[in-house]
Amino acid sequence: MPMKVAEVLELLAADGWYRSRTRGSHRQYRHPTKHGTVTVAGKPADTLHPKTLTSILRQAGLKDPR
């Protein structure tokens, strides 16, 4: 089942990611100890494509909670 952008943002925040910058609907997140950035695009009510969700979770080093 696809996830909403808001649910992904909650997962990132729970793991310690913080928003570093925004341009339009693209939010970029950084982590104090993990390397790299994670970009999440779309409005909070939008549904993410399954491959986009997989990519975001892989970049963040998280497992799919479902």
PLM-predicted stretches and their roles:
Residues 4, 21, 48-49:
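Secondary-structure boundary/capping motif
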Residues 16-21, 64:
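Short secondary-structure junctions
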